[in-house]
Structure formats: C-alpha cells, structure tokens
C-alpha cells in the first residue's frame, strides 16, 4: 500500500489492568489478523511472565488491515505499550514510532496515575491523543465522571470519547472508525534516502539480531545493504516484514510503516535500540533523535547457584541487554556466593522481571542479593568515592562524610488520601517542598532518600491511597546523612551478601526485624543456628533457630534416670561437634528478606 494517507501508526496508553491487551485482541480479531482457532486471550503478551502477572512488559507491534465504512482499506500499525512505572522507557520508545495514541480508561475506576504520566509523554512528543472509555459493560461504569476527570486532570477534550467494552466487543468497531478519522497519517517521502529508527531489537538463535523499525523516509527491501549509523557497519538485508501478529515477510518496508528487518547481524550490540538505519549508498543521512539513555536506580548482585553456569549467565545477560537497553551489569565476586554480576535496574519490578526472564528463557538458577543505591563517601584523606554495594564499604574510621542520594518526588493524589500519603513520606524521612491543589487532586513535592523510594515506596504508596496516587521522581543531589552498615552474622560468620546500609535511627529496629525474618526463612538444622545483626563490633539483635532433635529417650521404657541422662549427654556432645563443622545453607528467600521489612 504505497499511499501514506492510508497508514495509521498508533499505540495504546492505559493504566495496568484497564484492558489494553484485551482491546488489542479485539482489533486483531475484527481485522482478521488470526483465524478463530489461533485466537487466545492476550495474543500480544507473548511472554509467559506477561500472562501470569497480567502485565505488558515489552512493546509489541502488529500490522492489521481495516476496511473502514468509507470503503477504503487502512493499514493500522499498532504498537502495544506497558503501563507500569518501571517500564516508562518502553512507552517512550513506542510513542516515538507513532502519530497518535489511544488513551484507554476504565469507566469504573477513572483516570489513574500511570496513564497520566504516559499521556503527558505522548502530548510532549506531539501525538494526537484520543480518549476511549473501556469496560462499559460493568455495572459500576460512570462515563460522565470519568470524562470530567480526563478533562480536569489530563486536560484533553473528552466530550465525545468513544465508549466500548473490549471484553464483550461492544463499540470496538466505533473505536476503529474514530481512530482512522482522528489520528493523522504519517509524513515521509518514499523516494528519499532510507531513514529508519530502531524501536526494539531482540536476539534469535537462528536469525541473529531481529530489529523492529519505524521507517521515516525511503524504503528498504531484501538484498539491500544497510548501514547502522552508530557502529558504522554494513549488513545485507535477509528479509523484511511485519507481524500480523504472525511473522509475515513482505516485499519491502516503506516510509510510514512499522516492521522488522533481519540482516544476519551476529554481534549482539550490532543494532542498538534508538539507532538510525540507512542504505550504505547514502551514509550522509541525518541521525534521527533516539531515546535518552536511562540511568539505573537500583543495583543488586545476581549470582548463579552453580558456578559452572557463570559463562552461560554472561551470555544470557548480553542477549537480554539487547532486548532491554536499560539493564547494566559488571562482574562481581562475593565470599558467600562466588562469582556473579552486579546489575543495575530501573526499579524493583524491573529487577524481579529480569531475574524471572533469566531463569525461564535461559534456564539459569540464580540468587539475588538485596538491592542498594549508589552512595557517595568522602574519606579522611580527602578522596571522594562511590559505593553501590554495602559489602564494599571501607572501614567506618576512615570515612569523613557519608552522603546518600536524594530524589525529588512529585506525587499526585486525590484529596481524601492526602493524609495517608504525607504520613508515609514522613516515615520514609521525607521533607516536604510544596503542595498545590488542582481540582479534586493534590500535587505534593517531597525530597526523599532514594534508598527509601526504591525498596517498597511505590507499593506502599499505591496501597495507602487505594491505587490512586501517582509517583514521578528524579535524582536531585547527594546529601550528608548519619548512615551505618548493618552486618548479618550467621553462627558468628559475616555473610557479605546480606549486609545493608541503613540510617542510624532505624538501625536497631531494622536489625531486629531482619533477624526475626531470617529466623522464619532459614531451615532448622541439627544444631542451633545463631542469627545476629551488628553495627561494627556491636551486636544489636539476635535470634536463634532452634535445633531439630531426635527423641533419644523413646527406647527407654521406664528405667533408671542415669540411663536417660547418659543418652541426653551423648546427644548434646554430638550436637556440639556438629555445630563446629556444620554449614548453614541459606535459601534464596533469605537474601530477599530485606525487601519484605515493612519499615
């Protein structure tokens, strides 16, 4: 289809659970993308993980052909986007390839935080945003209130928002009709030199690197020689095509279209996301503005359970980095866990997802240590160093000043939940900067220590405000703080992977909570296991996992007390000997116990 006016590129912005993947399924069904027998719920959420958690993690693309009421057939290139705060970079990448976006709002729940943030991203990138009210078949749907909220909070006209129910299929054709009319056609010149933006890439064991691209200018076909602008390397195109949602090869990809290019690139970093592709004959083509590089906020150590898996683990991380450009890693070794990698993530959900993807897709068994942020230390020698791993902290006596990262957090919350949110921020050592009332919502700005934000702040903010509060934060500065290193000792030995950096005021509480938690998680042994929390040389908390004991008196029917004493003494001596040589196996849950401390 050479006519650009018949192409529509759009993505769907929606909060978690407002039904965007179901709506996508309906689009595919109505446009005949899949036969009825191939249709299954959430076609686009192809990762098992996405289905189980009911969230979209990776952006997916589908090309559909829709015959509109005006008799013309339109090519719809639809890019699915994630809704969770940790994956906002995926959203910005998807939006860069579109001219418009559908803002899908649950007619029962109304506008929620994440869609507000993503919607602003879309408006900043100059996209046409079209509101859609979903779940109209539910008894609690209240379209008028929700339209009012869209106008007040996001500031776009929602008077004639399309109402539909993706589950029952009601009104979905109306959404497609409106979409064709509202969203502008792409601009671009098919005869100009090729200019294509890489939205996403992933590694296929047989095909090499597969890149999902949005062609801005020109065309690309099989047999062309393409140049990757950032690496300067030239590759021969093996095939181009689109997902319908099945992998379908086409003759070429033209300006305005979204599809995949396979050019047997074997080097994992051969086609980085956000890069520009052009033909080798026109190397002077301008580089398209890519995406800003995302800085990791949270660092954690990942270690293979068996040291033989280290090489496989490194290969898996390399392949995953191609698909997820925000993941960073460097080698690390630990006394307790052996060799592994220190990885940087965007947030806690991102960390869990990466770990699960490594375990499932690459069949690895991993142990994760507690996450930490980057601290700045000024030593007494006058030197300044940064530390992202508590076990690498220098001796306290050599540190002149300990600084922690502070973030400026902007929280949008309905007025009735404001009190709970303020209480939470104070508990997390926050300092209020300002407060503004916007209609029924309040915007508060707080300076919060980053290590308080990354652990469980987002989850607790959601639960304390019934899911209505939204959070946006960015790094501001380093600030001096009274921080200490909390060590965990098991049977008198320090376990480096369990060390934590905490504020001195919270240290005693954290130490007690952590030892109690560890007591539940460490399996009982044949001898007593002492779990202690210490700051420097001072023990601040202790619990004991009691030994399992066999009833050695079971065989004594009555009999003399000295006989029983002898058996008990013998057992005691055996336990003592065992304790000297016994090793305690620490399960994976214990390393993550730190996260579950509801401070």
From Swiss-Prot:
<keyword id="KW-0472">Membrane</keyword>
<dbReference type="InterPro" id="IPR035654">
    <property type="entry name" value="LepA_IV"/>
</dbReference>
<dbReference type="InterPro" id="IPR000795">
    <property type="entry name" value="T_Tr_GTP-bd_dom"/>
</dbReference>
<dbReference type="InterPro" id="IPR038363">
    <property type="entry name" value="LepA_C_sf"/>
</dbReference>
<dbReference type="GO" id="GO:0005886">
    <property type="term" value="C:plasma membrane"/>
</dbReference>
<dbReference type="InterPro" id="IPR005225">
    <property type="entry name" value="Small_GTP-bd"/>
</dbReference>
<dbReference type="GO" id="GO:0003746">
    <property type="term" value="F:translation elongation factor activity"/>
</dbReference>
<dbReference type="InterPro" id="IPR006297">
    <property type="entry name" value="EF-4"/>
</dbReference>
<keyword id="KW-1003">Cell membrane</keyword>
<dbReference type="Pfam" id="PF00679">
    <property type="entry name" value="EFG_C"/>
</dbReference>
<feature type="domain" description="tr-type G">
    <location>
        <begin position="5"/>
        <end position="187"/>
    </location>
</feature>
<dbReference type="GO" id="GO:0003924">
    <property type="term" value="F:GTPase activity"/>
</dbReference>
<dbReference type="InterPro" id="IPR004161">
    <property type="entry name" value="EFTu-like_2"/>
</dbReference>
<dbReference type="GO" id="GO:0005525">
    <property type="term" value="F:GTP binding"/>
</dbReference>
<dbReference type="GO" id="GO:0043022">
    <property type="term" value="F:ribosome binding"/>
</dbReference>
<dbReference type="Pfam" id="PF06421">
    <property type="entry name" value="LepA_C"/>
</dbReference>
<keyword id="KW-0378">Hydrolase</keyword>
<keyword id="KW-0648">Protein biosynthesis</keyword>
<dbReference type="GO" id="GO:0045727">
    <property type="term" value="P:positive regulation of translation"/>
</dbReference>
<keyword id="KW-0997">Cell inner membrane</keyword>
<dbReference type="InterPro" id="IPR027417">
    <property type="entry name" value="P-loop_NTPase"/>
</dbReference>
<dbReference type="InterPro" id="IPR035647">
    <property type="entry name" value="EFG_III/V"/>
</dbReference>
<feature type="binding site">
    <location>
        <begin position="134"/>
        <end position="137"/>
    </location>
    <ligand>
        <name>GTP</name>
    </ligand>
</feature>
<dbReference type="Pfam" id="PF03144">
    <property type="entry name" value="GTP_EFTU_D2"/>
</dbReference>
<comment type="similarity">
    <text>Belongs to the TRAFAC class translation factor GTPase superfamily. Classic translation factor GTPase family. LepA subfamily.</text>
</comment>
<dbReference type="Pfam" id="PF00009">
    <property type="entry name" value="GTP_EFTU"/>
</dbReference>
<dbReference type="InterPro" id="IPR000640">
    <property type="entry name" value="EFG_V-like"/>
</dbReference>
<keyword id="KW-0547">Nucleotide-binding</keyword>
<protein>
    <recommendedName>
        <fullName>Elongation factor 4</fullName>
        <ecNumber>3.6.5.n1</ecNumber>
    </recommendedName>
</protein>
<comment type="function">
    <text>Required for accurate and efficient protein synthesis under certain stress conditions. May act as a fidelity factor of the translation reaction, by catalyzing a one-codon backward translocation of tRNAs on improperly translocated ribosomes. Back-translocation proceeds from a post-translocation (POST) complex to a pre-translocation (PRE) complex, thus giving elongation factor G a second chance to translocate the tRNAs correctly. Binds to ribosomes in a GTP-dependent manner.</text>
</comment>
<dbReference type="GO" id="GO:0097216">
    <property type="term" value="F:guanosine tetraphosphate binding"/>
</dbReference>
<dbReference type="InterPro" id="IPR013842">
    <property type="entry name" value="LepA_CTD"/>
</dbReference>
<feature type="binding site">
    <location>
        <begin position="17"/>
        <end position="22"/>
    </location>
    <ligand>
        <name>GTP</name>
    </ligand>
</feature>
<keyword id="KW-0342">GTP-binding</keyword>
């Amino acid at each position: 289809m050479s006519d650009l006016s018949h192409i529509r590129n759009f993505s769907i912005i929606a909060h978690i659970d407002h039904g965007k993947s179901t709506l996508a399924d309906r689009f595919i069904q109505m446009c005949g993308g899949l036969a009825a027998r191939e249709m299954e719920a959430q076609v686009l959420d192809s990762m098992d993980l996405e289905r189980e958690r009911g969230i979209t993690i990776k952006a997916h693309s589908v090309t559909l052909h829709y015959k509109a009421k005006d008799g013309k057939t339109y090519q719809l290139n639809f890019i699915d986007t994630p809704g969770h705060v940790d994956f906002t970079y995926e959203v910005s990448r998807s939006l860069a390839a579109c001219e418009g976006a559908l803002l899908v709002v649950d007619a029962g729940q109304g506008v929620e935080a994440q869609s507000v943030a993503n919607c602003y991203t879309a408006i900043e990138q100059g996209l046409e945003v079209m509101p859609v009210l979903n779940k109209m078949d539910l008894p609690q749907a209240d379209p008028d209130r929700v339209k009012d909220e869209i106008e007040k909070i996001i500031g776009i006209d929602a008077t004639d928002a399309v109402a539909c129910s993706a589950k029952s299929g009601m009104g979905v054709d109306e959404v497609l009709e409106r979409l064709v009319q509202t969203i502008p056609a792409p601009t671009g010149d098919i005869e100009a030199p090729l200019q294509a933006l890489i939205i996403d890439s992933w590694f296929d064991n047989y095909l090499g690197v597969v890149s999902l691209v949005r062609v801005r200018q020109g065309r690309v076909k099989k047999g062309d020689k393409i140049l990757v602008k950032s690496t300067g390397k030239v590759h021969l195109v093996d095939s181009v095509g689109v997902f319908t949602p099945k992998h379908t090869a086409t003759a070429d990809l033209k300006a305005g279209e979204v599809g995949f290019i396979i050019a047997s690139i074997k080097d994992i970093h051969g086609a980085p996301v956000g890069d520009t592709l052009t033909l080798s004959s026109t190397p002077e083509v301008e580089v398209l503005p890519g995406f800003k590089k995302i800085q990791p906020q949270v660092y954690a150590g990942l270690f293979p359970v068996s040291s033989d898996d280290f090489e496989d683990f490194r290969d898996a991380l390399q392949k995953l980095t191609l698909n997820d450009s925000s993941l960073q890693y460097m080698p690390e070794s630990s006394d307790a866990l052996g060799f592994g990698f220190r990885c940087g993530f965007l947030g806690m959900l991102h960390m869990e997802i990466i770990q699960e993807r490594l375990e499932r897709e690459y069949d690895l068994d991993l142990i994760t240590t507690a996450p930490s942020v980057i601290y700045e230390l000024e030593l007494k020698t006058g030197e300044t160093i940064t530390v992202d791993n508590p076990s690498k902290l220098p001796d306290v006596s050599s540190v002149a000043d300990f600084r922690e990262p502070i973030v400026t957090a902007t929280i949008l919350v309905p007025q009735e939940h404001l009190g709970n949110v303020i209480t939470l921020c104070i508990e997390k050592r926050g300092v209020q900067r300002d407060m503004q009332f916007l209609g029924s919502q309040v915007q508060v700005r707080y300076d919060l220590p980053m290590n308080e934000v990354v652990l469980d702040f987002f989850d607790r903010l959601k639960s304390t405000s019934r899911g209505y509060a939204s959070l946006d934060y960015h790094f501001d500065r380093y600030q001096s703080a009274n921080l200490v290193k909390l060590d965990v000792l098991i049977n008198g030995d320090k376990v480096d992977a369990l060390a934590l950096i905490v504020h001195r005021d919270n240290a005693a509480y954290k130490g007690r909570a952590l030892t109690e938690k560890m007591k539940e998680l460490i399996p009982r042994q044949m001898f007593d296991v002492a779990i202690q929390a210490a700051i420097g040389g001072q023990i601040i908390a202790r619990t004991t996992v009691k030994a399992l004991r066999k009833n050695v008196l079971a065989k004594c029917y009555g009999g003399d007390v000295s006989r029983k004493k002898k058996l008990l003494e013998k057992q005691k001596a055996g336990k003592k000997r065992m304790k000297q040589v016994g090793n305690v196996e620490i399960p994976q849950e214990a390393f993550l116990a730190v996260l579950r401390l509801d401070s």
